[in-house]
Amino acid sequence: DAWPEDTRWVYDNALKRGYHALSVQCPGQGMAIRVNGLPFRYDWENVVTPIVDVAVQLEGVDPERIGLMGLSFGGYLAPRAAVFEKRLKVCVANPGVLNWGESIRIGLPPQMSEAFEQGPEAFDAVVEQMRAHSALVDWFLRDSVWKHGVATPYELIQEFDRCDLTDLAGQIEAE
């Protein structure tokens, strides 16, 4: 959910250690969202597989030693891709998030949790009250709703609910 340049320190250090590093701007990130309007998608394997298709064609890339690292929301996205993209031999998830929606809902204040159970109108009304008192909450919600291609905070939580690896994590073959 950031620009690739934000994690340049990772790639610089990988290169110093003899690794190849490929940094891309995927849906929900950088120019993909800002210029092309491509929001995040929960089925990240559909983003990663074409990238791996290109990577294995690059000179010097060992197709038996391809890894994927995901930071922040990538802590869900990278393992999701690894479930389906079997050419990935290593997957780093920081933080490793099994169920993004659940992890968000657990952190909600009781007032918001109760409103969520009541439905979209109640939840969005409570969120609007919070936004009015916090520039940080307002920015986070505007940014997240936009990057995930939804219209409301309630829809954002529903979108996060799609990001669930509970029944899929056992299928990851990457280390």
Task: Please report, for each region that a protein language model flagged, where it lies by residue.
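Short glycine-enriched nucleophile-adjacent loop
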Residues: 69-86, 91-93
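Active-site nucleophile loop of the alpha/beta-hydrolase fold
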Residues: 26, 92-102
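Conserved alpha/beta-hydrolase
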Residues: 14-32
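The serine-hydrolase catalytic nucleophile loop
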Residues: 2-12
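Serine-hydrolase catalytic core
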Residues: 132-175
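Helix-rich cap/lid subdomain of alpha/beta-hydrolase
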Residues: 100-142
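Alpha/beta-hydrolase active-site loop
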Residues: 38-67, 77-80
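Serine-hydrolase catalytic machinery in alpha/beta-hydrolase-like enzymes
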Residues: 29-41, 102
